[in-house]
């Protein structure tokens, strides 16, 4: 007769986890009891395995149980039986392995030196490595020493054969990855008593490797800043240092994790060693930055270069350039109230209420008509009701902090009997802005994360010999349209002006002049400090002038166009004109300002030499023309069995001024593309305007 009893707590976790580490996690929360009546040991262990949904692998071991056995956990139950009946046990892959203690053995397993650490990690991850049994490594020789039950040693040996050893001669070397857009090294911004550190690609990659090697996820990591492992920003002296936002460059964290797992588990991936040095395996991987060449240096196996390239490509992406124009001004609160009353909803230029600047309230205002608002401010500045404190402008990359600081530092001396300390006290106006470009329904917008501190050093009311600091802080974020402005107010101040009026000469007479010929007056004015921030999208790191409507290239083209008109009266198109026409034709629209011609004024083959493998279809063509130039559209076809590229340089005749192919320049066998060719009208050239008769008799001009 046998009977099994179990007590399960109310919060017991399920007994079938996906991966068991040596012993099931549920065993820690479960008590076990077994009531045996002349029960064979094999039968008792089979009942035990059945209760926990496991298989039993056990050779014949003699023993009979005749008692009621209670244990605090299943592990304790097996240990008690093992001591009494001289057997060893371990759990792996939902199987309980039991073997006599006499079958305890040891083995020497040879692996590569780079795979020693990875074999131990792999055995731990799959739940096979048991700390109760012996384990030792000889990293320089590439040898693992293991001791335990025969079945346990056999499983370890089988796993060691699955670890791929690196090819001969494939030793670690320095791999160089030059960067185009991102910074390889960390950037440090010293900001008063704080230190902002924006991590470079080398630090980000090292942090990713460290985090992933410990089983952590990179989804919550701050990939811009660095202040220790996984933190975004390092504060040099302030615990209230704000964190930088996460990158918006479109990082695919899932792809990054997969690539990192390949690096870390491909023949021994690695992270930076902390503490003692270890030989071989992931401890030998090192990542550093080459500041001179803006490159990332990785010391690892050259065979993993492709894996690192995929990771670095996700980080080395171009970002937008944003210019931030800031206007800091003090304005009389009475005039400000009148100004805000004129800039309400009825004006249609401000997204806010008419009473945004009431007394005792902080203010945030959006301006869309910046020109009219600036005119109002200039008028107030002219009559003395407003004064501009500063008008700085700074250019920065999106998601990178821009800091503007106007501060004053006083030094406070604290003396004692033998010690004198000097503490700096800093106050003033500081502005920290982190911009980010957005696209909402095709309309560009800019998100601003703003931190403002405004303060000044005054004389203390308690001790005249000690300074007093008055500060105000604003931390906010907003999304505004491009070319709009954000106004932040709420910094109130009281300004007192003492004026003395006296009669010349008589007012300087002692005693009498002060009483009879002088008068004093004090004017108190309440002022509010405003911060007007205007972000402008300049471009990106690939083409900084991409978003400039009147950039330098177009200005040069316009001036050259005017010079050409004065020289020969012809109006030749600029690059912008040709690009605009080609874009309209790609979109399926007829070019503006051009009429549809019936036939081409040129022979098809005279426009372009298609080259070997390509042919131009003369039956299918279009011609759009204006007075001085036009665009011919022909069809190019690949007649070969290999991909062929349309070479635009072959369309470089005397009349051609621009060429483009759509939808593809590379044509697969049998594929066709349209070729747009911008050409000058023959009649506008000087040869067409003027003719010269030939001196040869019978020759045609």
Swiss-Prot record:
Location of this chain's protein in the cell: Cell outer membrane
Q: What is this protein's record name?
A: Type 3 secretion system secretin
Q: Where is the composition biased (Gly residues)?
A: 229-238
Main localization is membrane
Biological processes annotated in GO: protein secretion by the type III secretion system; symbiont-mediated perturbation of host programmed cell death
How is the subunit organization of this protein annotated in UniProt? The core secretion machinery of the T3SS is composed of approximately 20 different proteins, including cytoplasmic components, a base, an export apparatus and a needle. This subunit is part of the base, which anchors the injectisome in the bacterial cell envelope. Forms a stable homooligomeric complex.
As for family, the record states: Belongs to the bacterial secretin family. T3SS SctC subfamily.
Which PANTHER family does this UniProt record tie to the protein?
PROBABLE GENERAL SECRETION PATHWAY PROTEIN D, SPI-1 TYPE 3 SECRETION SYSTEM SECRETIN
Annotated spans, Disordered: 229-252
**What UniProt keywords apply to this chain's record, in alphabetical order?**
Cell outer membrane, Hypersensitive response elicitation, Membrane, Protein transport, Signal, Translocation, Transport
Keyword Membrane attached: yes
Q: InterPro entries of this UniProt entry?
A: Bact_Secretion_Sys_Channel (IPR050810), NolW-like (IPR005644), NolW-like_sf (IPR038591), T2SS/T3SS_dom (IPR004846), T2SS_GspD_CS (IPR004845), T3SS_OM_pore_YscC (IPR003522)
Natural source organism: Pseudomonas syringae pv. syringae
Query: Where is the signal peptide, in residue numbers?
Result: 1-21
Which superkingdom, per the lineage? Bacteria
What the entry lists under Pfam families is as follows:
Secretin (PF00263), Secretin_N (PF03958)
Q: What does the entry list under GO cellular component?
A: cell outer membrane; type II protein secretion system complex; type III protein secretion system complex
Transmembrane annotation, as ranges: none
